[in-house]
């Protein structure tokens, strides 16, 4: 907390910008599948049609925004595009559109809105560099803001939907864009852009393989996390026979500990290095997911949920700085690549979960999630430390 108290006003505004931006998008993203099935009356498999458009388009959007930030395009107009896209998406959803319109128009618009997170993280990194703020700790606070937002946003939407319906919930989400816009106006100077940097030679015709391998580590961790998160509710309730509220308790325990772990991750990275922290997170994930596959009581779920929060908090606290360290001269590209690695991991995890569960069981999905930590350790063993700059 003393770190934040010592930050200049602008740095604190950036933290608030990231928090409210994440709260806005998190009020839409986790509800979408529920909305497609319950709100629009579609079949569950049709969720994949929407997700199959949003995920790859988000990857493209993040790449384009990252390249423009590295080419010294001002941050403010790029971020405004994503905020406007979010507002349009929330208004579209509040109209309860036909499914074809959601897929044809809503999915591309949501992909543009998703680009806000990458842009904000790049802006935070650039601001920290310019003002001599310790980057690893500041990134950890940015990531903690996202984690806190995801505690608030989804819960707010689901409770509102349960009480008054989808239309009101999405109108509230649209209203949140007003706060996001005010923070955008206050936190981002009109002419803020990346500094000009000397070109750094890369290997093998411009392909930075070490940067890609660093991003692959994040993709593999994201695959395991999404495999578990997607299968966990049905495994607990259907296969283990635990009460319906059990998944919510697990998520709550995870989120609380995750925030604490993000604080400690930066200090551990300073002492042992980010690769060691990520390796520790992967080992903890393997053990935790394997234990989850054998739970038989709510108490066990809550305890393991807290441990899961610690592993994911370690990852969340250092991952973005870890990837950025392999491209210090191109923070926009590195940040976009990091965000895309998470979206790619989420896409692979969500699709794979359905096939594995259909062929075997939801318990098998959780075992696969545990096994996904092994290639993380192998990739970290191969990956060399970043070049000093």
Please place each PLM-identified region on the residue numbering.
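Structural signature of the two symmetry-related core transmembrane helices
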Residues: 77-91, 174, 276-290, 370
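Hydrophobic core of transmembrane alpha-helices in multi-pass small-molecule transporters
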Residues: 19, 100-116, 219, 300-314
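Transmembrane alpha-helical segments of major facilitator superfamily
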Residues: 50-58, 146, 249-258, 341-342
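Cytoplasmic helix-loop-helix junction between adjacent transmembrane helices
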Residues: 109-144
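Helix-to-loop junctions at the C-terminal end of transmembrane segments
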Residues: 60-74, 161, 261-273, 357
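C-terminal transmembrane helical hairpin of 12-TM major facilitator-type secondary transporters
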Residues: 275-319
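A late C-terminal transmembrane helix in Major Facilitator Superfamily
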Residues: 329-359
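Helix-loop boundary and gating motifs at the non-cytosolic
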Residues: 3-55, 222, 226-239
């Amino acid at each position: 907390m003393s770190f934040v108290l010592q930050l200049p006003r602008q740095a604190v505004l950036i933290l608030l910008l990231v928090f409210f931006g994440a709260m806005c998008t998190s009020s839409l993203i986790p509800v979408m599948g529920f909305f497609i099935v319950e709100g629009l009356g579609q079949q569950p498999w049709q969720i994949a049609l929407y997700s199959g458009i949003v995920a790859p388009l988000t990857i493209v959007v993040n790449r384009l925004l990252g390249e423009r930030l590295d080419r010294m395009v001002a941050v403010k107009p790029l971020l405004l595009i994503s905020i406007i896209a979010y507002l349009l998406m929330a208004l579209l959803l509040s109209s309860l559109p036909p499914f074809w319109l959601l897929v044809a128009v809503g999915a591309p618009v949501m992909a543009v809105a998703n680009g806000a997170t990458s842009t904000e993280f790049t802006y935070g990194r650039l601001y920290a560099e310019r003002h001599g703020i310790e980057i690893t700790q500041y990134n950890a606070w940015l990531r903690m803001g996202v984690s806190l937002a995801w505690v608030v946003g989804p819960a707010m939407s689901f409770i509102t939907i349960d009480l008054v319906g989808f239309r009101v919930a999405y109108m509230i989400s649209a209203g949140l864009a007003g706060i996001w816009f005010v923070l955008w106006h206050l936190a981002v100077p009109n002419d803020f852009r990346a500094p000009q940097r000397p070109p750094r030679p890369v290997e093998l015709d411009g392909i930075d393989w070490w940067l890609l391998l660093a991003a692959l580590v994040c993709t593999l961790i994201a695959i395991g996390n999404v495999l578990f998160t997607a299968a966990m509710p049905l495994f607990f309730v259907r296969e283990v026979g635990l009460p319906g509220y059990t998944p919510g308790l697990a998520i709550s325990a995870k989120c609380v500990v995750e925030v604490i772990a993000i604080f400690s991750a930066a200090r551990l990275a300073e002492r042992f290095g980010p690769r060691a922290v990520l390796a520790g997170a992967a080992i903890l994930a393997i053990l935790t997911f394997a234990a989850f596959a054998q739970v038989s009581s709510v108490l066990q779920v809550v305890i393991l949920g807290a441990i899961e929060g610690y592993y994911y908090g370690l990852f969340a606290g250092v991952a973005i700085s870890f990837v950025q360290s392999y491209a210090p001269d191109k923070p926009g590209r590195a940040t976009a690549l990091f965000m895309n690695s998470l979206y790619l991991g989420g896409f692979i995890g969500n699709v794979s979960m359905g096939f594995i569960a259909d062929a075997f069981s939801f318990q098998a999905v959780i075992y696969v999630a545990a096994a996904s930590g092994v290639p993380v350790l192998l990739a970290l063993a191969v990956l060399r430390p970043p070049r000093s700059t």
